[in-house]
């Protein structure tokens, strides 16, 4: 049975595509649209991509990674028609002239949270002291390997050092290539906690959010979309950006842990 929420969303996509067609903005739907995207938005995009493809005929070829991985991928010259990356990386690309002027669109910002397995008792992580206690008591903690350039992993490692438990955390760390993979480690019982972007936690079955990092420690990452100057299908890329930033998508972003963009 299709839920009311799913039905409403399918309707909004259909309505949105009708508007695109009416104003001559719908993509021609020929070659795959090549997208380089941050893992933090992976869950949301996976929820809408099938409906969007069915309504428009547009197919996609995604390359997903951490900020560090994507920085290297883009520097290597890999072709992309659309990029969805963190605001700092987007700023770097703007400065080097790799983006189509005026194509940047702010998508939202997301914080970091503590993820546990479904059914497990949720530790108190509401204050810095409570979070430190939960980390010390955990048998294992999964997070993105800082060496992979994952924003949440780099930040969490700095928090552990600030707490004075950096070495202790390293001894029981389960390091992964991305936040989604860290949440999967928890879902499959190989780690007790995962410290990942909230958007990555809510997208993985078998886990739940114990809570966001305490306000005094929270670190938000903003994400944006833009069209590279080398894009071979800017019309299709612009249509998808318009879909992502439409009013119909606002609740979808919120339900995936994102807050509205501040810029």
Regions found by a protein language model. Give the residues of each.
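N-terminal secretory signal peptides that target proteins for export/translocation
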Residues: 1-8
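Bacterial N-terminal signal peptides
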Residues: 10-24
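Exported/periplasmic ABC-transporter solute-binding proteins
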Residues: 27-76, 87-97, 101-110, 116-263
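Periplasmic-binding protein-like
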Residues: 81-84
